[in-house]
Amino acid sequence: MSSIAEQLAAASSLNQVTVPDLWQQEAVTALRAGKDVVVQAPTGSGKTLIFELWSKQGKNRGQAIYTVPTRALANDKLAEWRARGWDVGIATGDLAENLDAPVVVATLETQKNRLIRGDGPVLLVIDEYQMLGDADRGLNYELAIALAPPQTQLLMLSGSVANPQDVVKWLIRLGRQAVLIRHEHRPVPLDEVFANNLNFAVPSSVRGYWPRFVTKALADDLGPILIFAPRRQGAETLAADLARQLPPPPHPLDLRVDQKQMVGEHLAKLLRS
């Protein structure tokens, strides 16, 4: 007969329990007290869990709009929460579905007119709020925050803002009650490497900063490599340049049909080349 400890360990419901850290509990407590919350915490530390706890796993009273910078991120969140059985809608530039759901994942620009009308949700989540500093989209983010009606609480999440305290001061100047929750521990270590310290001799046939840098990094076994570009066109141009100049891998990637549909035919061809 198994011990009580073994029975508890085998209980699937217990294996799925997530116990929030103190900083996450503080953020949820502040939200439930009616305050705006600005969260500064590293990637992978559990910022999204704050919203999930506040919403009681998608069973929140009143609507919450969870905004993300890109349509791809919106689709990811939609799929994740629907897989858990949540009633979730989506609003992006090219898709609007189930907009009366308790939780709607959206790009922020789709909500601007609603906020201007004063028709805000109970909670507006701005994930990756460092977009305030974006040269092209920052104005839309600033307007959305400044025009959010008093009855709409704000939850602003980021891991890459150097001065979150100034954002809190700005919210207070707007007449809002705002607090800063800061968490410094990084669950995924981050090491900085200077490009000049990579000593691999790149062949002269490889030209341009990024192709030469990626060649050096791969030679030092620093892959996989993820490069961010401000726009899709820039990302595709860079991907094409890298695919053209870097030596091909011994086994080009053979994507499944669903993977080809996800990345698009253009990028699928690059991966095969």
Residue ranges: model-predicted function:
Residues R61-N113, K169, V179:
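Conserved nucleic-acid-binding Ia/Ib motif block in the N-terminal RecA-like helicase ATPase lobe
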Residues M1-Q40:
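Conserved pre-motif I regulatory segment
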Residues L143-L147, T152-L155, S160-P248:
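Conserved interdomain linker/interface between the two RecA-like ATPase lobes of SF2 helicase motors
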